[in-house]
Regions:
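Short amphipathic alpha-helical interaction segments
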Residues: 330-344
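Conserved N-terminal Rossmann-fold NAD(P)-binding element of oxidoreductases
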Residues: 10
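Auxiliary N-terminal substrate/complex-recognition segments of SAM-dependent methyltransferases
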Residues: 7, 214, 337-341
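A short, conserved structural fragment
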Residues: 344-354
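C-terminal scaffold of the Radical SAM
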Residues: 3-5, 26-48, 52-330
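Minor-groove-contacting beta-hairpin "wing" of winged helix-turn-helix DNA-binding domains
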Residues: 355-359
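Local cysteine-cluster metal-coordination motifs and their immediate loop/turn environment
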Residues: 13-26
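Short, amphipathic alpha-helical interaction segments positioned at domain boundaries
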Residues: 361-376
């Protein structure tokens, strides 16, 4: 009998504004069938007969684009049949612009115990430049309200290497983030995705981005500054105070299975990676017909081993060679020994006892290093 996943990702695709860099599955909330969407999403969730979860993550889009009453329906529907004694972490993503007191009260009265705020930058001019509608003052107001409501597990997302951004602006952002006195931060360099405003501008030569060496300096500065402030750099883009690592995201990097619920959501169950219908109307119809999925991919053993390496090497702790061999019944040294020795020689990887992991230099070249673990 297959072991059931103990994590679930729930996708709320609605936004009150569309950011210029975002390619996630999302729609402008106005005139959307939000109540019907929530009803269908909860129907899909119920179809898996989920009773025990260790982590539950509600992302988007923007979950807090929902009204307070809609949030209440969602949270109640998701947790009604769950054994809350084993639910370690329930995260919800929020935008500083739309998290008001009523919504915070709903979160407080639910099983939510972790809030992730999409700050992106503290610079009002830059916020406008990247298509965000909130202001710096909204960030402080929301953090204060969340702390007052008793939330101590708060995370923020920041983006660096933004158009026209200087090293001084990055330093200012990091200093303001540290001053918030919160236990977790995710910092991502800007990645240009197709079908975004920024990619269109880039193609027209109208997007002045920092040079690659400046981006590398920004990354090095961020790591050093946050480590000095007591944060552990536990994954390429993530930093936490001790004990406040994102358990849900660690699940992804441990290559564990999880349910993906909602329009455009991806999941990994019984060795099958799947993706749900993206457009809202298509998703609603698919749920009514009893199957929200549009694609399914049965991973081969080779693909599973490759993913174990790609994902695991994102973590500071890297990959356990013993666990790898127990999981796949293959010799780690036979598959990857030569590659690891070569990367160690280049200063991109190190071997600590049972574990292989990337060096700081390796982390910056993460994708290039990961490509070496594709099996021929």
């Amino acid at each position: 009998m297959q072991k059931k996943p103990t994590s679930a990702y729930v996708h709320i695709p609605f936004c009150t504004q569309i950011c210029y860099y975002c390619d996630f599955s999302k729609v402008f909330i106005k005139n959307q069938p939000v109540n019907s969407y929530l009803e269908h999403l909860l129907e899909e969730f119920a179809s898996y007969d989920i009773q025990k979860l260790r982590t539950l993550y509600i992302g988007g889009g923007t979950p807090t684009a929902l009204s307070a009453s809609q949030l209440e329906v969602l949270l109640d529907g998701l947790t009604r049949n769950l054994d809350l004694s084993v639910l370690e972490e329930l995260t919800i993503e929020a935008n500083p612009g739309d998290l008001d007191e009523d919504k915070i009260a709903v979160l407080k009265n639910s099983a939510v115990n972790r809030v992730s705020l999409g700050v992106q930058t503290f610079d009002d001019k830059m916020l406008k430049k990247i298509g965000r509608s909130h202001l710096e003052k909204d960030i402080y107001e929301n953090i204060d309200r969340l702390k007052l409501a008793g939330f101590d597990n708060i995370s923020i997302d920041l983006i660096y290497a933004l158009p026209g951004q200087t090293m001084e602006q990055v330093k200012d952002n990091v200093a303001k983030a540290i001053a918030l006195d919160i236990p977790h931060m995710s910092l991502y360099s800007l990645i240009l995705e197709n079908h975004t405003v920024f990619m269109n501008r880039m193609r027209r030569g109208k997007l002045p981005l920092p040079k690659e060496e400046v981006e590398a300096e920004m990354f090095e500065y961020i790591i050093a500054a946050l480590e000095r402030a007591g944060f552990e750099h536990y994954e390429i883009s993530n930093f936490s105070k001790p004990g406040f690592e994102s358990r849900h995201n660690l699940m992804y990097w441990d290559n564990a299975e999880y349910y993906g619920i909602g329009a455009g959501a991806s999941g990994y169950v019984n060795g099958v990676r799947y993706k749900n219908h993206g457009p809202i109307r298509h998703y609603l119809k698919a749920v009514e017909e009893g199957n929200a999925r549009i694609t399914e991919e049965h991973l081969t053993l080779r693909e599973q081993m490759e993913e174990e390496m790609f994902l695991g090497l994102r973590k500071k702790s890297g990959v356990s060679m013993t666990r790898f061999e127990e999981k796949f019944e293959r010799s780690f040294d036979g598959l990857y020994g030569e590659i690891v020795r070569d990367l160690v020689q280049q200063g991109l990887m190190q071997v600590d006892g049972d574990r292989v992991r990337m060096t700081k230099r390796g982390l910056f070249l993460g994708d290039t290093v990961a490509e070496r673990f594709i099996l021929e």
